[in-house]
């Protein structure tokens, strides 16, 4: 099965190990992974900030880059959700609406692809410790991916998965929200970390690097002994 990787900006710039883990995991499960080098930002930051014209140019480049892909897989619920919004954004555009629909139809978040397309729940991973899972707002509310990550994590050998209190509560990142509304964002992430501590977790696992950047950065600043991991790293682990 041929899979085209959409790596996302945050992974490309800050979390390259997540991209590598994603490729290794997919290849181990029998996929042939390629990386269209013409890909760019999905356009979400610009679009959400009101720069619609500029965002659309990035979106058009994404549609060109992945035109020949069979499946587009990304280790980001937020960016996958944005690609799924392209048909709405380009509705009525005679040149781009059809392309937007094609890209949206073949785009999957990583755990969604593993469970719904490959029909795999046990990927043979092992990681010893106590973990809790944070689901991002976009992944849950826009993309609708809720159970797939948990079903995969439940099969990780040696991992004790415990519920996160108020799991669906925002971590306070929200893209530019964390910049424009810094004091509020800080209170939100502090509350999230408090819930992680309630779970007495060794690991905080998530599927969106924006959330992990926000939560992990605050954990580091506070000096908390909690390791933050992307779910791709966990599913590719052999500890």
From Swiss-Prot:
Q: Which GO terms describe its biological process?
A: lactate metabolic process
Q: Which GO terms describe its molecular function?
A: oxidoreductase activity
GO cellular component terms given for this protein:
cytosol
- Fetch the InterPro entries from UniProt: Cys_rich_dom, LutA
Q: What does this protein do?
A: Is involved in L-lactate degradation and allows cells to grow with lactate as the sole carbon source.
The record's similarity note reads:
Belongs to the LutA/YkgE family.
Q: What is this protein called?
A: Lactate utilization protein A
């Amino acid at each position: 099965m041929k899979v085209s990787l959409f790596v996302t900006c945050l992974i490309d710039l800050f979390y390259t190990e997540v991209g590598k883990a994603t490729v290794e995991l997919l290849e181990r499960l029998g996929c042939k992974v390629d990386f269209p080098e013409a890909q760019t930002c999905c356009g979400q930051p610009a679009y959400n900030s009101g720069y619609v014209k500029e965002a659309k140019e990035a979106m058009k480049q994404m549609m060109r880059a992945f035109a020949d892909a069979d499946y587009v897989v990304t280790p980001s619920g937020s960016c996958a959700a944005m690609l799924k919004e392209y048909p709405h954004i380009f509705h009525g555009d005679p040149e781009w609406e059809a392309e937007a629909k094609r890209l949206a139809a073949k785009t999957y978040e990583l755990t969604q692809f593993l469970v719904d397309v490959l029909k795999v729940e046990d990927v043979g991973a092992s990681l010893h410790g106590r973990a809790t899972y944070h689901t991002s707002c976009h992944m849950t509310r826009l993309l609708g991916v809720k159970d797939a990550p948990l079903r995969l994590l439940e099969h990780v050998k040696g991992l004790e998965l415990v519920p996160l209190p108020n799991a669906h509560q925002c971590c306070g990142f929200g893209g530019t929200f964390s910049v424009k509304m810094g004091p509020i964002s800080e209170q939100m992430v502090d509350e999230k970390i408090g819930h992680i501590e309630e779970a007495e977790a060794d690991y905080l696992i998530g599927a969106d690097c924006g959330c992990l950047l926000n939560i992990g950065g605050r954990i580091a600043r506070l000096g908390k002994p909690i390791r933050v991991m992307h779910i791709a790293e966990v599913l590719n682990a052999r500890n």
